[in-house]
Amino acid sequence: MNLVRETAPEGLNSLGLTLNTEKSYTWSSTAHGTELVYLGYAFKKIGGKADVSIAGKKINVIKTRLTKSFVRYAKDHNFDMLKMRVKFLTGNFTLYQADTLLPIRVGLFFNYKQATNTDCLDDLDKYYQKLLHCRTGKLGSHIAMSKLETKDLEKYSFRFGYENHVNHHFTTDQMDMITNCWL
């Protein structure tokens, strides 16, 4: 490991890059329960196996987007936009590269398909259901959704979208409208 620490800065410099020592650390995979977060995944050694899950920061980003979607709905009562935002977060969709029109599949499954532990999806589903059925408090009291609308949104699930690779279609304009409340 010392060899890496000694040679990495020199190798990076030759590429015109520098090592950010404030964000760099040595990870010991032998320490039980130690977690490495990299590229949206959390790697953890449990027993003799590696546990790969969606990183906590990414889960928090999804929860924040869900909350912001419901906050926007509480203000504008645009059910169709809320439904599109929920579909966007719980499912997958295809983008096309502008220059080649090659498809790029993105979304919950395609962004995290290397995860071996998907328990966090149940946590996301519980969080979503609490938001959906909340009728008290600062946010809940402003969500005036009919029973039919609530029932319509109940069918969306992070676990189902992930395991069944649920794919939705959104136009560019729709994606802009969906994501504008998360900025």
Question: PLM features: what roles do these ranges have?
Answer:
Residues 8-16, 132-139:
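A generic secondary-structure signal for well-formed alpha-helical elements
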Residues 1-13, 47:
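Catalytic palm subdomain of template-directed nucleic-acid polymerases
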Residues 21, 30-183:
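Right-hand nucleic-acid polymerase module
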Residues 16-22:
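Conserved short beta-strand edge segments in small beta-sheet-based binding/regulatory domains
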Residues 3-7, 17, 141-145:
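Composition- and surface-driven signal marking solvent-exposed, interaction-prone regions
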